[in-house]
From Swiss-Prot:
GO cellular component: membrane
Pfam families xref list: Hexapep, Hexapep_2, LpxD
Subunit composition and interactions: Homotrimer.
Functional summary from the UniProt entry: Catalyzes the N-acylation of UDP-3-O-acylglucosamine using 3-hydroxyacyl-ACP as the acyl donor. Is involved in the biosynthesis of lipid A, a phosphorylated glycolipid that anchors the lipopolysaccharide to the outer membrane of the cell.
Enzyme class at the top of the EC tree: transferase
Protein family according to the UniProt entry: Belongs to the transferase hexapeptide repeat family. LpxD subfamily.
Any one GO MF annotation of this record: N-acyltransferase activity
Protein name (Swiss-Prot/TrEMBL): UDP-3-O-acylglucosamine N-acyltransferase 2
Pathway involvement of the protein, from the record: Bacterial outer membrane biogenesis; LPS lipid A biosynthesis
Catalytically driven reaction(s): a UDP-3-O-[(3R)-3-hydroxyacyl]-alpha-D-glucosamine + a (3R)-hydroxyacyl-[ACP] = a UDP-2-N,3-O-bis[(3R)-3-hydroxyacyl]-alpha-D-glucosamine + holo-[ACP] + H(+)
Organism per entry: Francisella tularensis subsp. holarctica (strain LVS)
Alphabetic keyword roster: Acyltransferase, Lipid A biosynthesis, Lipid biosynthesis, Lipid metabolism, Repeat, Transferase
Keyword Lipid biosynthesis: yes
């Protein structure tokens, strides 16, 4: 429980109303009640703002006139919300306890205030920094290094010689450093596996979602740069480089040896081919199929939106005739000339 005045001081915001009101939890405008703090970041919700029963809201000066309760006025309510949610977050944190059923190699170096859960396995020559949390059944293979203040949640699998920076979060069932999809085909059609000798390097302040896989490099390293955000069920193939502060939404797949620049946003279910580059500050819409390099910043979209079945059928039928139509247009152009 926090006073509104305390929260405002943490947010560099200005209280409008009762600064002593007590805040117990966070809620949406429509669901909030006494003791709740809410937020409004979208003009679509001004009616909900005016009707909310929240004890306080996070808003900008521009919408203050629609607010009928206590408020903290600031320039970026959404960022303020993130900071308030950190205060109320009950996620596991390191407490220095190592479970008796954890298996830790004698050569591993464990920092101060590290938590290691039941049935977790820490391999030979692993280095774990201070204030690290390792959840139950996580596995950390030989030679891996994990920086300070990183959270490795339950059932995460980290392969050998991976490097993870400080302040990272890796969610349940993610797999980091598995073999990339490298095979050589013989003349008779049979496959020979190519050993994957590179590493995965995850820089500071990176978050990786549940069920995501990041393959180790074949020769060069796979690199996730500082501040990147990767959602659930994303596939990052070998030798890929993800730039600083770039975000990839769920079910996206990035094929091998592709480089994505800094500050990019990749929509969910996108498929990005291998051996291309995407420049800084690129936005790719959801379900897009990117087959060649992007060299100019901007917004790109390459997917069909859902349509009623009959309308879609007509569209496909017309699309099948487009070559014939182009030929006819060219013939007409020749006649006009």
């Amino acid at each position: 429980m926090y006073s509104l005045d305390f929260l405002a001081s943490k947010l560099d915001g200005e209280v409008k109303g009762d600064k002593n009101v007590e805040i117990k939890k966070i809620a949406t405008l429509s669901q909030a009640g006494e003791g709740d703090i809410s937020f409004c970041t979208n003009p679509k919700y001004l009616k909900a703002l005016s009707e909310t029963k929240a004890s306080a809201v996070l808003i900008t000066e521009e919408v203050l006139e629609f607010c009928n309760t206590n408020a903290v006025v600031l320039s970026n309510p959404y960022m303020a919300l993130a900071k308030v949610m950190e205060l109320f977050d009950k996620s596991p944190r390191p407490d220095g306890k190592i479970h008796s059923k954890a298996v830790i190699a004698a050569s591993a170096i464990i920092g101060e205030n590290v938590t290691i859960g039941a049935n977790a396995v820490v391999g030979e020559n692993v280095v774990i920094g201070d204030n690290v949390y390792i959840g139950a059944c996580a596995t950390i293979d030989n030679g891996t290094k994990i920086g300070n203040d990183t959270l490795i949640k339950s059932n995460v699998s980290i392969a050998h010689d991976v490097v993870i920076g400080t302040g990272c979060i890796i969610h349940q069932n993610a797999v980091i450093g598995c073999d990339g999809f490298g095979n050589a085909r013989d003349e008779d059609g049979s496959w020979t596996k190519i050993p994957q000798l590179g590493r995965v390097i995850i820089e500071d302040d990176v978050e990786i979602g549940s069920g995501t896989t990041v393959d180790r490099g074949a020769i060069d390293d796979t690199i996730i740069k500082k501040g990147a955000r990767i959602d659930n069920l994303v596939q990052i193939a070998h030798n890929v480089v993800i730039g600083r502060n770039t975000a990839l939404a769920g079910v996206t797949a990035v094929a091998g040896s592709t480089t994505i620049g800094d500050n990019c946003l990749i929509g969910g279910q996108s498929a990005i081919t291998g051996h291309i580059s995407i420049c800084d500050n690129t936005i790719i819409g959801g379900a897009s199929n990117i087959g060649k390099s992007i060299t100019k910043p901007g917004m790109y979209y390459a997917a069909f939106e859902a349509k009623p079945r009959i309308q879609w059928g007509r569209f496909v039928a017309k699309l099948a005739k487009i070559d014939t139509l182009i030929t006819k247009v060219k013939q007409l152009e020749e006649k006009i000339k």
